Structures are given as structure tokens and as C-alpha cells.
């Protein structure tokens, strides 16, 4: 694989078969961030976003992206698209300009793209950036991580602002999704789903990984089962799809089923062509 475009493995592959990582580090400073863990935590999970060490400046970053996206274009399109990003928030003030340049290039090549972020300033404060993507919206889906736990994400935009930004994009014809991952508390996650639903086209729900005591205050899997039933009931009434990630199925001991449930391959850009579970 290339310096910036690659095929994710493991749990990350549930999000996208291809991803682009231009930066490492993130100023959102989320306490649960996976990138902060392990021997590479000081590099991957640093508090300041920096270009990857193999890239010297933005010019080289874009040139590298252009070369790699041209090389892998047909495979990326065949597999469903390209995600920005697993190693940082792609819409931080330090990262958004290069991200948008690469997204515009990729969608101009008819490559579907996903953006996953906790930032809203590029939409709510600087609407020029969002407006510039209007021509790409048929090939672009924008997702916001919603936990309802602002105290665990001190550098990120408040969850309420993310819901507002999602609605802003949705009202302008953008495809939107909510990443309800990690679930911190079932109550907060259900509240986020209810709040985001009017401006959201797809929900993805996953549990916190790597912390055995994360749900010590709950009776598992019974309380998780109740949460799943509440979410499925609400989204079925609203006609909105939800993808329950493998972490949920594993904790329950069985796959999650329901009229609103979809698989990992659900195509938010072409929902009518996607078979639901």
C-alpha cells in the first residue's frame, strides 16, 4: 500500500475498505481514543496534528495522495470508497484544507468519499468550505461521532454543535451518518440518536473496546439488549437504517436483527441498491 492510502484491517475495516491518513495526532484529546494506546501512542495519539513523518510538507502530501489515488482508483471505486481518516480528525483547523483538496480531487475522479469528524467550525463558522463541496455531495458522505460525553472530548466541538452541523449539511442535500461509537452510556447514546435522527441518513453503533470495566455499572448483556431494542424500535418508526457493529453482536452473543438493521456494506449514497439484513 501507499504512504497515505491503504486498506484498513481489523475493526477499522468495518468503516471502510480504503482509508487516507495524511496526519497523525489530534487536538480533540478524547480520553477513549484508540490511537493513544500502545507503544505508538505518543506518535499516533499526540495532542497536535502533524503530517506523517514520511511526508515533509503539504505539497508533498498532496502530490503523494494524487499519485496513490490515481494508482488505486479502480480498486477503491470497486470496493465502495475512501474514508478520511483514522489517524486524526480530518476537519481540524490544521487538517481541513488539505483534506478538502484531496476529497475534491477524489470525487472529481468519481471516487465515493467519507469524512468522519467531531469538528464543526468548517461548517458552522466557515460555511465557504461546506459550500465548496456542494458539487461533490452525490459522492460524499459526512459523519459525526456522537457520544453525548463532551467531558471526554475536551478539544472537540460539543455534541450539540455536531448535531446542528449534521442537520445543516443534510438540509443542503449531503449524505450524513452518525457514528455512535463508542457508546459511553446507553442513555447518552439513545439521546444522541433521537437528537440526530432528523438530519441523519445512517447510524453506526459500536461499544468501547479495550476497557473491561467500561460497562461495569450495567447488567450485561441484558441492559445492552434493552438498549438495542429501544434504538431499533425508534429507528424503525422513523424509517432510518442502523448498522450494529461487531462489538455489539459479540457482547450480545448473537447478531442484531430488525427491520431497520443493515450490514457493513450498506451504501449510504445508493440506499435503494443495498439489501437490508
Q: Where in the sequence are the language-model features?
A:
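Short loop/turn segments at secondary-structure transitions that flank enzyme active sites
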Residues: 26, 36-39, 90, 148, ...
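Conserved AdoMet/S-adenosylmethionine-binding subsite of the radical SAM
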Residues: 63-234
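Feature targets compositionally biased, intrinsically disordered low-complexity regions
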Residues: 1, 9, 79-80, 142, ...
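Short linear functional motifs in flexible/disordered or boundary regions
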Residues: 38, 42-45, 96, 190, ...
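C-terminal accessory extensions appended to soluble enzyme cores
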Residues: 215-277
Amino acid at each position: 500500500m501507499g504512504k497515505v492510502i491503504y486498506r484498513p484491517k481489523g475493526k477499522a475495516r468495518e468503516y471502510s475498505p480504503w482509508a487516507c491518513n495524511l496526519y497523525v495526532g489530534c487536538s480533540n484529546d478524547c480520553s477513549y481514543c484508540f490511537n493513544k494506546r500502545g507503544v505508538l501512542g505518543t506518535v499516533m495519539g499526540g495532542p497536535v496534528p502533524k503530517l506523517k513523518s514520511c511526508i515533509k510538507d503539504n505539497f508533498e502530501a498532496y502530490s503523494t495522495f494524487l499519485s496513490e489515488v490515481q494508482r488505486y482508483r479502480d480498486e477503491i471505486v470497486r470496493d465502495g470508497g475512501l474514508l478520511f481518516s483514522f489517524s486524526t480528525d480530518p476537519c481540524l483547523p490544521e487538517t481541513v484544507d488539505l483534506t478538502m483538496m484531496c476529497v475534491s480531487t477524489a470525487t472529481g475522479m468519481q471516487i465515493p468519499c467519507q469524512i468522519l469528524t467531531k469538528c464543526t467550525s468548517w461548517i458552522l463558522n466557515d460555511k465557504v468550505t461546506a459550500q465548496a463541496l456542494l458539487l461533490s455531495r452525490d459522492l460524499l458522505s459526512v459523519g459525526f461521532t456522537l457520544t453525548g460525553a463532551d467531558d471526554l472530548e475536551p478539544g472537540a466541538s460539543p455534541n450539540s454543535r455536531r448535531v446542528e452541523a449534521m442537520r445543516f449539511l443534510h438540509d443542503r442535500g449531503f449524505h450524513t451518518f452518525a457514528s455512535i461509537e463508542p457508546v459511553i452510556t446507553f442513555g447518552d447514546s439513545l439521546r444522541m440518536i433521537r437528537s440526530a435522527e432528523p438530519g441523519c441518513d445512517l447510524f453506526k453503533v459500536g461499544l468501547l473496546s479495550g476497557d473491561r470495566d467500561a460497562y461495569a455499572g450495567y447488567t450485561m448483556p441484558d441492559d445492552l439488549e434493552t438498549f438495542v431494542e429501544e434504538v431499533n424500535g425508534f429507528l424503525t418508526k422513523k424509517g432510518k437504517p442502523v448498522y450494529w457493529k461487531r462489538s455489539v453482536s459479540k457482547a450480545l452473543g448473537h447478531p442484531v436483527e430488525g427491520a431497520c438493521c443493515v450490514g457493513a456494506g450498506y451504501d449510504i449514497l445508493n440506499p435503494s441498491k443495498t439489501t437490508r439484513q
